């Protein structure tokens, strides 16, 4: 049998007493006193969106709105290069037949968009298109060909 370790062989570190009080528990949050404004200074676009399908559709905060589910009907051309103006890791849900107004903001950074429904797979910025595909017109043609619903609407720029 092994011997029990003795306290002399394994001394405990000396505890020091302080008057220091923790400002927050370990792992606690540090919150700003002022409200946080997301996407500050970015231009906003408001669109009316309708779910024409028979199932609920949920769109996450950073999904390229131009490429959302084909059964959502809205002016897709106005949503090119934009995403929902909601906090990260949140979503907007459209029940069948629902019609809602959503506010969109441009993607930040270099505005390269890949994946989603593969309608864009490239640059989504404004201005002259770089030397590679796609551009807004090609993406719109691809969406129409694949049956993504769209309608011309009175989408507006929000302040």
UniProtKB/Swiss-Prot annotation:
GO terms for molecular function: urease activity. GO terms for biological process: urea catabolic process. InterPro entries: Urease_beta-like, Urease_betasu_sf, Urease_subunit. Pathway: Nitrogen metabolism; urea degradation; CO(2) and NH(3) from urea (urease route): step 1/1. Residues 1-24 are annotated as: Disordered. It is found in: Cytoplasm. The keyword Cytoplasm applies. SUPFAM superfamilies: Urease, beta-subunit. Its main location: cytoplasm. The keyword Chaperone does not apply. Gene3D superfamilies: Urease, beta subunit. Its EC number is 3.5.1.5. One of its GO terms (cellular component) is urease complex. Keywords: Cytoplasm, Hydrolase. It catalyses: urea + 2 H2O + H(+) = hydrogencarbonate + 2 NH4(+). Disrupting the ure2 operon has no effect on urease activity, or pathogen survival in BALB/c mice when inoculated by gavage, but confers slightly enhanced resistance to low pH killing in vitro. NCBIfam families: PRK13203.1 (NF009682), urease_beta (TIGR00192). PANTHER family: UREASE. Belongs to the urease beta subunit family. Heterotrimer of UreA (gamma), UreB (beta) and UreC (alpha) subunits. Three heterotrimers associate to form the active enzyme. This is Urease subunit beta 2. It comes from Brucella suis biovar 1 (strain 1330).
């Amino acid at each position: 049998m092994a011997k029990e370790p003795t306290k002399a062989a394994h001394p405990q570190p000396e505890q020091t007493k302080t008057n220091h009080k923790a400002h927050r528990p370990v792992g606690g949050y540090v919150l700003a006193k002022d409200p946080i404004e997301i996407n500050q200074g970015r231009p906003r676009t408001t669109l009316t969106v309708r779910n024409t399908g028979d199932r609920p559709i949920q769109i996450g905060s950073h999904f390229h709105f131009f490429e959302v589910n084909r059964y959502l009907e809205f002016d897709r051309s106005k949503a090119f290069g934009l995403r929902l103006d909601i906090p990260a890791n949140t979503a907007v849900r459209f029940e069948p037949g629902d019609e809602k107004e959503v506010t969109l903001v441009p993607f930040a950074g270099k505005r390269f968009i890949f994946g989603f429904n593969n309608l864009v797979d490239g640059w989504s910025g404004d201005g002259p298109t770089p030397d590679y595909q796609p551009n807004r017109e090609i993406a719109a043609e691809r969406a129409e060909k694949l049956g993504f619903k769209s309608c011309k609407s009175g989408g507006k720029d929000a302040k």
